[in-house]
Amino acid sequence: MSVILLAIPTLFIGFISYYLWIWTYWRRRGIPGPLGYPLVGSFPKTLKSEYPQYLQIRDWTKLYGPIYGYTEGTIKTLIVSDIDIVRQIFVEQYDNFYGRKLNPIQGDPEKDERTNLFSAQGFRWKRLRAISSPTFSNNSLRKINVTVEDSAMELLRHIEEQTSEGQQIDMLQFYQEFTMDTIGRIAMGQTDSQMFKNPLLKFVRAIFGDNRKHIPLIGGVFPTLAQVFRFFMLKFPLLGAANFIHVNKTVVTAVQNRIDQRENDRKNGIEIGEPQDFIDLFLEARADDVEHFQENNGDFSKTSSYGNRQLTTQEIVGQCLVFLIAGFDTTALSLSYTTFLLATHPEVQKKLQEEIERECIEPSISFDHLSKLKYMDCIIKETLRLYPLGTMANSRRCMRATKLGNVEVEVGTMVQVDTWSLHTDTKIWGDDAKEFKPERWLDPNCDQVFQKGGYISFGLGPRQCVGMRLAYMEEKMLLAHILRKYTFEVGTKTEIPLKLVGRATTQPETVWMHLKQRI
């Protein structure tokens, strides 16, 4: 009994000492940053959906400079916005920072059967990347151009119905319908448009609108209990994962249905034609006995072999799931921000409409027509400079001890780029850094800024977003069709400036617009 009585205070003191050691980690190393609170660190400040994490980080950068640290429970995070250090992380020291910053509640990317291209690392990531990349080649995008245009025309029909009497509409809601419809048709086996009647949309929206803080908090503060909580969370959806579980089951069903269909076709002697969507493309590489390539004693090299270019059924589910979630949200947000900036900068919108009329003469818009819309490219890039989207993706885990600038970085430390500050740094972009100026992208120097690490809307280096070209194609197709017929105008419901909310991504609460029909 006396041993137990002695052990309890000893364990308690050890527990407190450990968390105090983590809490003061950056302070002891002479690195500035917000101290936060014992046990949780600065987590309470970064989990506010009403004031997104990346705006809070931007505020801290103004206080502490281009490199500082803070803790999220036991997670040690280094924030950087120095262009030279950014390039080191993503390019020059890629071998030391090839892992993502993941909350322990998300699982172990080395062991999860459904690890996807976003969370995978090492040889497994290389294999998934090598298999996925052809999906987004120009040749593949040309094949789905007709499908994307059909979804764009379907949305245009709904816009016409909703604005026939001059009503204002929330473009964010409409764009989410478009991206959900498009990704469903090119990645999920959906055969026709389900716009404004897709039962899955509310569940996907809810994933991004989930404001519950206990899930990431438990993972950050009690990492050893994270997998236990994850197990119960997936078994009992009411604990916080109901929406994700529903979406996941839908993807599993879509993949299994396609597998069954292909097997039945083989039995009946029906030849399997060219892949029609992402599921087909991934099933071409399916092999359920594929080896999961793990790193050899923690050693990873950019020149290492890709290994077996095959996917398990579970990995196919993982790829389709991440493409669905990522493709839905980010493209809809980019369209929303672009629309807002066009409405508040009518001279830019007029110039864009002139380009569309000049380059897209035929009623149908081809992939080649889209490639000629250079000014639209500038507008989208400038929009994403001022409103970077999934900045969470611009974070890495230190896999090998190294040095960034004058800071020694230990294994397991998370490094996150303050993209909002980087993208409006006057030393990089000039005195007009905070102004919407698409013409700046006509200057060849902007390409050099990208190469140096000053523009990372789609990431940088080997892990740059694989779906970037698809996102551009979707946006350009839809905007071209809308702006042929309408002009975006600020309405009485339009919030200026936009009210930004969210956690996984930073999004406008609403984007109300008046669409004036062109003569």
Curated annotation (Swiss-Prot):
GO terms for molecular function: heme binding; iron ion binding; monooxygenase activity; oxidoreductase activity, acting on paired donors, with incorporation or reduction of molecular oxygen. The keyword Amino-acid biosynthesis does not apply. Its cofactor is heme. Its EC number is 1.14.-.-. It comes from the Eukaryota. Keywords: Heme, Iron, Membrane, Metal-binding, Monooxygenase, Oxidoreductase, Transmembrane, Transmembrane helix. Its main location: membrane. GO terms for cellular component: membrane. It is a single-pass membrane protein. Pfam families: p450. PROSITE patterns: CYTOCHROME_P450. SUPFAM superfamilies: Cytochrome P450. Heme binds at C465. The chain crosses the membrane at residues 3-23. Cytochromes P450 are a group of heme-thiolate monooxygenases. They oxidize a variety of structurally unrelated compounds, including steroids, fatty acids, and xenobiotics. PANTHER family: CYTOCHROME P450, CYTOCHROME P450 FAMILY-RELATED. Belongs to the cytochrome P450 family. This is Putative cytochrome P450 CYP13A10. It comes from Caenorhabditis elegans. The gene is cyp-13A10.
